[in-house]
């Protein structure tokens, strides 16, 4: 085998491993450990490869910020959910259901979110 062939094969394997690790959500989030939170949607990052939402909840007098990761914007667009739907909820109360991060941080994989107008958005390809 030539050095060029070995190099190409090694590069392909490295790329495949990186892509697999990035999309292996079960390694990052525990699908059996769910949390439901009600709080203020304080930030939204609506871009590829995954949207990110920050929900500020209260624990007594302490505010806890939760980082919730969701699918790509195109996932939501295909389900008739637009950036403007979520932007309208900024600085308002939302209820979110998420799978917790395995590392114990205040992070989760978004499953569903109820917007202030009562619209429920699902971040699951099928039933959550």
Feature map (PLM): residue ranges:
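Short boundary/loop segments of OB/S1/cold-shock single-stranded nucleic-acid-binding domains
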Residues: 19-35
């Amino acid at each position: 085998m030539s050095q060029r062939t070995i190099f190409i094969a090694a590069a392909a394997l490295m790329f495949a491993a990186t892509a697999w690790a990035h999309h292996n959500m079960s390694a990052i989030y525990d699908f059996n450990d769910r949390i439901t939170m009600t709080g203020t949607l304080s930030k939204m990052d609506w871009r590829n490869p995954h949207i990110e939402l920050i929900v500020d909840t209260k624990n007594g007098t302490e505010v806890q910020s939760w980082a919730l990761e969701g699918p790509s914007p195109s996932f939501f667009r295909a389900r008739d959910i637009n950036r403007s739907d979520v932007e309208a909820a900024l600085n308002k109360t939302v209820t979110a259901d998420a799978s917790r991060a395995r590392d114990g941080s205040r992070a989760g994989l978004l499953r569903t979110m109820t917007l202030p107008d009562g619209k429920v958005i699902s971040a699951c390809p099928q039933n959550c």
